[in-house]
Structures are given as C-alpha cells and as structure tokens.
C-alpha cells in the first residue's frame, strides 16, 4: 500500500468496484514515534492515492480517521468542525491523511472514530481480559476519556454511507464522528470489561481496577486526555447502530474460544 503503482494495480485487479472504503492504517501509536516515515506513508500518502483512484473511477470513497487528531479536550465533546491539533506522530499522520483524502477526492466522507474493539485479539478488551486472568489488580488511567467503538458497528456505518448518496450529501463537510455510545475513562472501561468477563465465564472472579493518571506512565507518544467525539450528527442522521454496553459481551465471549 506504500507503493502507488502496486496499490493501483491491486485496485484495478479487484474488478468492477462500486465504492472504496479505506480501512488500512498504521495504528501503533507508540512505535509511530520512531517510525514516522512509515506512519505517514500508510496513513497519509497511501490514503491520498486510494482517494485519487476512487475519484478517477467516479465512485464513493470512505476513509477512517481518529479522535487523536485532537488535543486534550477543554469542553465536553469535539465537534467535526473543531480545529485539530494532534499531540503525537500517529495523530499527525492521520490528520495529514484527512487532508490528502480531501484534496484527492473532495466528495469523500471521512469517519473519525475512537477506541475501536472487536472479537479479534489485539485490542484493549482482550488485553484487559488477559491481564485480569493473572494479575491481582490492574492499574488503569482515569484521565483518558473517550468513546468505545465496536468494529462491526463502524463497518456497517461505512458501508451504509458508501451505498447511500443522499446520506453522503447530508454529512456536513464530509466529516462524521462515529462511536458506539457514551464516553468513559479507560479505568471505567476496564471495569466494565472485567464485569462482563465474570458474567460470561471468561474470568473466574472480578479483579479490582486501581485508578491512576497518565503522567505515571512513561510513553513515547503523548495521548490526549479528555478526547470525546461529539456523535450528535451521526445520531441525527440515523447512522448510529448500537451501544458498546450491548456489544461488549460479543467481544468478551470471543476471548473464551
């Protein structure tokens, strides 16, 4: 995907394409600080090329972005039109991708999302369950606040947008914030995961979660603290499909298999 010719060849070989949804991304927030060129190659350059190809084919293009394009929040929620100011390389590369996509395909729709999890391993839900199986307690930050997003909900939203021209035109500025419900802290999300883990039989007993602050952890990348996306536009357009409280059990049950 970091080679334009190869990317175009793969897209051409895919046969007739009615829409293109770009879910490819470099998402390792920590490693991006030392792999800046690769992060920008995937999140910015490749995104722009994919958008340009879609524009050339005259087909809809939907692109995923992130809440990390914003800094620490100083109000309740970030609106789509609020000024961006990323705090780390990952966020900078995703913001550059937004700009590249918009230039290459002005009719594109960019979906910003946050805290994505699914049934697949490697996300926050499964990491919490793994730690809770062996640790007497977990220490989690309580000053990082956001909205969890169930990956299938996000995929359904993107597919619907790609298929519905009227809906795309209704999205203001081609920017949409999407997640699966209410905001909470990382610590509280971990507690919810553990509670459901016990209910679903993935965990034998509940493990206490101890609150801490982000400054107690040494990390290469700085994370925004209160970074909550305003999803009122998605709700008004009827794009929202569900709540993370309802879908979290699906992800937790998958860890049992």
Annotated model-derived regions:
Residues 8, 34-62:
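NAD(P)-cofactor binding segment of oxidoreductase domains
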Residues 157, 164-219:
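Mid/C-terminal beta-alpha module of Rossmann-like enzyme folds, strongest
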Residues 1-42:
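NAD(P)H-binding glycine-rich loop region in Rossmannoid oxidoreductase-like domains
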Residues 20-24, 61-66, 71, 111-113:
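SDR active-site strand-loop-helix element
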Residues 242-257:
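Amphipathic terminal alpha-helices
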Residues 99-160:
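NAD(P)-dependent short-chain dehydrogenase/reductase
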């Amino acid at each position: 995907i970091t080679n334009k010719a190869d990317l175009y060849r793969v897209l051409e070989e895919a046969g007739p394409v009615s829409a293109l949804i770009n879910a490819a991304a470099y998402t390792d927030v920590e490693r991006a600080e030392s792999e800046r060129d690769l992060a920008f190659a995937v999140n910015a350059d490749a995104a722009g090329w994919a958008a340009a190809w879609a524009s050339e084919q005259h087909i809809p293009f939907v692109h995923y972005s992130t809440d990390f394009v914003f800094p620490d929040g100083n109000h309740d929620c970030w609106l789509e039109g609020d000024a961006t100011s990323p705090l780390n390389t990952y966020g900078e590369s995703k913001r550059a991708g937004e700009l590249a996509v918009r230039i290459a395909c002005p009719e594109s729709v960019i979906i910003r999302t946050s805290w994505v999890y699914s049934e697949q391993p490697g996300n926050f839900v499964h990491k919490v369950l793994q730690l809770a199986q062996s640790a007497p307690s977990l220490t989690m930050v309580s000053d990082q606040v956001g909205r969890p997003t169930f990956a299938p909900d996000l995929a359904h939203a993107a597919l619907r947008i790609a298929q519905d021209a009227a809906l795309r035109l209704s999205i203001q500025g081609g920017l949409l914030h999407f997640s699966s419900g209410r905001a909470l802290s990382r610590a509280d999300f971990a507690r919810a995961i553990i509670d459901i883990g016990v209910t679903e039989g993935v965990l034998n007993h509940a493990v206490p979660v101890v609150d801490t602050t982000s400054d107690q952890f040494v990390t290469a990348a700085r994370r925004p603290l209160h970074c909550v996306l305003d999803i009122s536009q998605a709700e008004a357009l009827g794009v929202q499909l569900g709540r993370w409280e309802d879908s979290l059990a699906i992800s937790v049950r998958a860890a049992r298999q």
